[in-house]
């Protein structure tokens, strides 16, 4: 890690405490604000919202006037919804299926409020994944672990929750199979509603051996994927913004970008020394919002919303230097 995690997170906790000092908005309050936003979005009426004079809105990394972009094309709400509230930082992230021109799709929405409960930051990741939205709506409800409180005796600090979540990104970036991967045995990951771990083989195909395969498999466990060393082509995971943390439930939401440079990172060696060529053949980037469930220092559940973006895309919230860095960033 290129920075002092403890120092950065200490500043982040202080920044979150500023909102709390002004007048805390609890879980129900934050969820109510998110619901109000989604209703105003479908009504195409930003005037229904309580907005700060300096409110900032981005959509897939682009700064827009509030009411533009997805506000023009949205036609309804879907049936899947997952709220993650950070009462300390005054922020909430919502994963939700929606309708755009009548078609199912997914959004990851981040809202930040001030001490008067006015919206100051609105960030939307719009994922045009009709199949993913249908998958989530077939699942119906968020996985129980995301809604379950961690026993008080097992709760840890915000800094510790972020530290464990960040090990996921650090372990995937230029993955070599030799890192420390804090996965629980029951770890599972959904990506735009689809299983990317522990998935059944298509047509009854057998599970490949992680120790001899040349491409990683969605049939493997979280740990098997990382220990295979076959994710090396994820050249960089940057602009890692850990903006919402729920200590009560052991949840962390990060926004980030996964870069595939299509260059030398495609040629690498597996942990046992085999030479492999894998990964995208043209440069491109995933823009991603990723939710982690952490218990007793291990990752149990992971859920991601992502959309393909131009290579090197930035979030619209970070400086150029921070947007290109893999350091931990925190709520301001």
Each predicted region: which residue ranges?
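C-terminal and inter-domain tail/linker signature
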Residues: 20-332
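Bacterial N-terminal signal peptides
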Residues: 4-15
């Amino acid at each position: 890690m290129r920075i002092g995690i403890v120092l950065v997170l200490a500043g982040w906790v202080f920044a979150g405490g500023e909102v709390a000092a002004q007048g805390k908005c609890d879980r129900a309050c934050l969820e109510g604000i998110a619901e109000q936003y989604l209703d105003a979005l479908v009504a195409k009426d930003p005037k229904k919202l309580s907005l700060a004079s300096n409110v900032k809105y981005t959509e897939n990394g682009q700064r827009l006037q509030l009411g533009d972009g997805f506000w023009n094309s949205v036609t309804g709400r879907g049936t899947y919804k997952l709220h993650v509230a950070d009462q300390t930082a005054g922020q909430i992230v919502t994963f939700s299926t929606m309708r755009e021109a009548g078609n199912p799709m997914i959004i990851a929405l981040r809202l930040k409020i001030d001490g008067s409960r006015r919206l100051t930051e609105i960030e939307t990741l719009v994922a045009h994944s009709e199949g993913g939205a249908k998958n989530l709506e077939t699942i119906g409800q968020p996985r129980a672990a995301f809604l379950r409180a961690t026993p008080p005796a097992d709760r840890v600090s915000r800094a510790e929750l972020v530290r464990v979540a960040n090990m996921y990104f650090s372990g995937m970036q230029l993955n070599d199979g030799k890192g420390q991967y804090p996965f629980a045995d029951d770890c599972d990951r959904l990506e735009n509603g689809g299983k990317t771990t522990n998935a059944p083989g298509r047509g009854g195909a057998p599970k490949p051996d992680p120790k001899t395969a040349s491409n990683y498999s969605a049939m493997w466990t979280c740990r098997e994927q990382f220990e295979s060393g076959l994710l090396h082509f994820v050249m960089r995971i940057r602009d890692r913004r850990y903006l919402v943390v729920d200590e009560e439930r052991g949840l962390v939401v990060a926004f980030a970008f996964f870069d595939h440079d299509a260059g030398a990172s495609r040629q690498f060696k597996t942990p046992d020394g085999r030479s492999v060529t894998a990964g995208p053949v043209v440069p491109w980037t995933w823009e991603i919002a990723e939710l982690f469930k952490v218990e007793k220092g291990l990752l149990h559940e992971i859920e991601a919303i992502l959309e393909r973006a131009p290579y090197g895309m930035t979030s619209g919230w970070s400086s150029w230097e921070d947007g290109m860095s893999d350091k931990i960033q925190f709520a301001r």
